[in-house]
Curated annotation (Swiss-Prot):
The keyword Hydrolase does not apply. GO terms for molecular function: SNARE binding. This is Exocyst complex component 3-like protein. It comes from the Eukaryota. Belongs to the SEC6 family. Transmembrane segments: none annotated.
Length: 739
């Protein structure tokens, strides 16, 4: 196509159009010209060069116009070419549209023709299916017999042959299904149950792996091979995966748990120890059998020993959890279970045996018992043991109380001391329970140790209560006790034995002071026994002191001789008491006698009639003091701890011949005995019988005005326990002398 023809085909451009930039360019040019012109007019010397500027601008304008024309011409040519190409494309699109319309019509005609051929197509498909069936018909006729034969092989436990036969039938089913377009023939309906029967046979063989490994390893190998081969097979049929490998592994685990932890094997009441002992023997043997017999029958990736160990551990853990959820265990079963779980199971006799390889390690698995389980078992064990310990201790105490009423004196040991097996029984009960728990855990030992101390404190309180009842019944005459005091002294030996031996209940880990409550109860018991003994002594001495002082007392030593005889006879039983309790008894007995002596003096039964009687009373008191001092020295009481010197001090008060010096004597008496009161001094002055009112007031004022006595270490109360005017029982048990 030449240029003339092309120009005819191109559409004409519309005229009268302007560039949008033209007006702005013109404004800029005018502005630049005005700016230049204003500069020229401001500088007249430049006017001479105006012609040159005009020529230069004319040339520049011509050059710009030429360039603009060239650009515009090029632009117009490109626009014409583009318009022409659009026109050509429009013609091509219209042609393609017409061709597509014709093709659509042809397709519509072909679809109508194809519908008429659909019956023919169906006949062709049926023909192909019939052709395939005709070719497979001999094999299809043999399917029922093959299914029956396969079932026979399964029943005969010929698993590999049964699996081969099953796979042949399944392959025939696939070959038949493809040409039939997925159509399932009724002849293959028995393959599903047949495959399930074979799977169950594989599971049954795996579940009895331990027994088969010993008796028929070939069957176990066949079952495992069937499961492994089937895991690698694929099928074109849309069937759910059989997953016989996982079923085989689950059967291995379930069979193993059933053998050792089946419901029928659960321990009954009192059978836990026997059951755990059987497991101690059976589980290592099972692992050894798995390593020696089962592992060679299985692929390496089965990790038979690890599978066995983990399965046994998990089954045992679940079994123990079920056991804890059932009826509460007895203390013997609880102790056995704790010791077995914490020491035997992981010990060298079982899972920690060096004969087992690292695959049998179960230390990284969940423990058989959680911390909560262990705490619960320990609490249960301690509660049950505490109940039995309390029962045993009460039974021992009841037996001891019965012994107190015997007609014979208490038994003595080879050294002649009163003796009873009660302290040894008590400590043995407690110490054995603590010692036994040491083989389980420190926490259990701590719990039982705390329980033992608590029960020992309770036992001591019960012992004290029993003593009080025993004494009350005896004093009221409700019970005849031939040897009341000897049995009281025997209980004091019991207290000493417990005090000296209670340290065996203190393990090394116990912090100091943990035995303080028990020691406090023992101290209370000792004081109570001493008080009861002294009350018995008072009951014998009070009738004698009722006649002191008197005219008979002034003239004869018989009254005090009777006191000394009864005291000596009473204290003879002290020789059967062990030290240091015997010293405590002697101190308190001597102090009790002195207190009774002082109480008798304060009652005002005697008033001296003159100087001779005062001298006689002073000599009698000096003689009595010497007699009492000699008595208790003979019994083994040191002179330094005796209270008898108070009688010598009172003797000076009576023996004073000048009543005006009573203030000095009273002041000295107060320095020696700070607890002496005005009532005591007044009663002693009444005994003199020669003190006037003024002299009495002067003596009492010296008692009040005198310097405060200096405190002395170990000084014990004396006059503060002497009532005026009426006597009463009094006793105290702090340590220290009266002097």
């Amino acid at each position: 196509m030449d240029s003339a023809a092309r120009d005819k085909t191109q559409p004409a451009l519309p005229t009268g159009l302007e560039w949008p930039e033209q007006e702005r360019a013109e404004q800029l040019a005018r502005g630049a010209a005005l700016k230049w012109a204003s500069g020229i007019f401001y500088r007249p010397e430049q006017l001479a060069r105006l012609g040159q500027y005009r020529n230069r601008e004319v040339q520049r304008t011509c050059s710009l116009e030429a360039r603009i024309k060239s650009v515009v011409q090029s632009y117009l040519e490109g626009v014409k070419t583009g318009v022409w190409q659009l026109a050509q494309a429009l013609e091509a699109v219209q042609g393609a549209r017409e061709a597509l319309g014709q093709a659509r019509g042809l397709l519509r005609d072909m679809a109508e023709a194809a519908q008429t051929l659909e019956p023919l197509r169906e006949q062709v498909v049926e023909h192909k299916q019939l052709q395939a069936l005709s070719q497979l018909l001999p094999r299809l006729r043999a399917v029922p017999a093959a299914v029956a034969h396969t079932q026979t092989l399964i029943d005969a436990q010929r698993l590999l042959e049964a699996y081969v036969s099953l796979r042949e039938l399944e392959q025939l089913q696939e070959e038949t299904c493809v040409p039939l377009g997925g159509l399932e023939l009724p002849v293959f309906e028995g393959l599903g149950p047949l495959a399930e029967a074979l799977g169950q046979a594989v599971e049954a063989a795996a579940g009895a792996a331990g027994q088969l490994a010993r008796e028929n390893p070939a069957l176990l190998v066949a079952a495992v091979r069937v499961a492994e081969v089937d895991a690698g097979c694929t099928t074109s049929l849309e069937q759910a995966p059989r997953d016989w490998r996982q079923r085989c592994l689950r059967a291995l685990q379930q069979g193993l748990e059933r053998v050792h932890f089946g419901t029928s094997l659960q321990p009954g009441p009192g059978e836990l120890a026997k059951w755990l002992e059987a497991l101690r023997v059976a589980l290592p043997a099972e692992l050894a059998m798995a390593e020696a017999l089962v592992a060679p029958c299985c692929p390496p990736h089965y990790k038979v020993v690890q599978l066995w160990a983990h399965t046994l551990h998990g089954g045992l853990r679940r079994c123990l959890q079920q056991l804890l959820e059932g009826p509460e265990l007895e203390e013997a079963d609880t102790f056995t279970l704790l010791h077995w779980v914490l020491h035997v199971y992981q010990g060298p006799e079982m899972m920690g045996s060096l004969e087992l390889g690292p695959e049998a390690d179960v230390s990284d698995l969940e423990p058989l018992l959680t911390l909560e389980n262990i705490e619960q078992l320990e609490a249960t064990f301690v509660a049950k043991v505490q109940a039995k310990v309390a029962q045993w201790l009460q039974k021992a105490l009841d037996g001891e109380v019965v012994e107190w009423g015997r007609e014979q004196e208490p038994d003595t040991d080879l050294s002649g001391f009163y003796h009873s097996p009660l302290p040894a029984i008590v400590l043995q009960i407690l110490e054995e329970n603590i010692r036994v728990t040491r083989i389980v855990s420190v926490s259990l030992e701590q719990r039982v140790h705390g329980m033992a101390l608590s029960e020992l404190s309770a036992f001591l309180r019960s012992f004290t209560d029993a003593l009080i009842r025993f004494s009350r019944d005896h004093l009221r005459g409700e019970a005849v006790v031939p040897h009341y005091v000897p049995y009281l002294l025997a209980t004091l030996n019991h207290q000493l034995a417990l005090s000296s031996s209670v340290s065996v209940l203190q393990p090394k880990w116990v912090v100091p002071g943990v035995l303080a409550p028990v020691e406090a109860e023992l101290d209370k018991l000792q004081k109570r026994i001493c008080r009861l003994v002294l009350e018995a002594l008072l009951a014998e001495l009070q009738p004698l002191f009722a006649a002191l002082p008197s005219r008979r007392w002034l003239s004869s030593p018989e009254l005090l001789d009777d006191v000394c005889k009864r005291t000596a006879r009473f204290c003879q039983n002290f020789q059967h008491v062990r030290n240091p309790a015997v010293q405590l008894l002697l101190v308190e007995a001597e102090r009790t006698v002195v207190l009774q002596y002082l109480s008798a003096l304060m009652q005002g039964r005697l008033v001296c009639r003159g100087a001779d009687e005062r001298t006689q009373a002073a000599e009698r008191m000096q003689h009595d003091a010497a007699q009492l001092q000699e008595l208790f020295l003979g019994l083994g009481l040191e002179e330094s701890v005796q209270c008898v010197p108070v009688l010598l001090a009172l003797k000076e008060l009576l023996n004073l011949r000048d009543p005006t010096l009573l203030g000095l004597v009273v002041a000295g008496l107060r320095q020696q005995f700070p607890d002496v009161s005005e009532d005591h001094v007044s009663a002693l002055l009444d005994l003199r019988g020669d003190v006037s009112r003024e002299q009495r007031l002067a003596a009492l004022s010296s008692l009040r005005a005198g310097p405060q006595p200096s405190p002395q270490a170990g000084r014990r109360a004396l006059f503060s326990l002497v009532p005026t005017p009426a006597p009463s029982l009094a006793s105290c048990f702090p340590s220290g002398s009266c002097a």
